[in-house]
């Protein structure tokens, strides 16, 4: 059997209540688990961007999911990508015990080597943030865990932009505008 591959779907929609539920329902019906989900305003006014990751064995299933999402009336555009086609980042947040960090200088060195930043320090805890790839964020977590200093840990969902010069949604919107103008 073929190995599972991580796919990233970039979905653009109008900011309409209930569209998130409609999009996730497509995955549920096809029994595909969403690994991560990030929703935010896009660079296009009035359009929101959904970055969704899911593991699957079969690219054809991901194509079907993408097409079903794109059929939703409030969805402007949906596309799927592999990691090679995207510039990807996540954010990891770590709350560490300040007394433990102060007792062991190796923890501070580890944070600096990972290019993480200490963003808050008080007598009880210090907050650390790291922006990077999933592996970097989880590797830092496991390294810090060995020092028994982690009080809390979380990482964001993936955010991504395509490596192409123009996103497909821009081409699609330009085409829609040309069609609209040609009908006048």
Feature locations, PLM:
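Long, contiguous binding/interaction regions
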Residues: 1-49, 56-184
């Amino acid at each position: 059997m073929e190995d599972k591959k991580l796919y990233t779907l970039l979905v653009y929609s109008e900011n309409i209540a209930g569209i998130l539920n409609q999009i996730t329902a497509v995955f549920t019906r096809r029994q595909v688990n969403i690994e991560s989900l990030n929703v935010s305003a896009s660079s296009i006014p009035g359009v929101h961007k959904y970055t969704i990751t899911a593991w699957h064995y079969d690219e054809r299933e991901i194509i079907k999911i993408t097409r079903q999402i794109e059929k939703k009336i409030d969805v402007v555009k949906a596309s799927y990508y592999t990691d090679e086609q995207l510039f990807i980042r996540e954010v990891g947040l770590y709350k560490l015990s300040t007394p433990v960090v102060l007792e062991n200088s190796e923890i501070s060195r580890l944070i600096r080597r990972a290019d993480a930043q200490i963003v808050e320090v008080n007598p009880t805890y210090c907050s650390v943030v790291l922006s990077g790839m999933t592996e970097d964020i989880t590797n830092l977590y496991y390294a810090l865990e060995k020092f028994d200093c982690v009080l809390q840990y979380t990482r964001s969902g993936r955010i991504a932009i395509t490596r192409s010069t123009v996103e497909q949604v821009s081409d699609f919107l330009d085409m829609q505008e040309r069609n609209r103008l040609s009908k006048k």
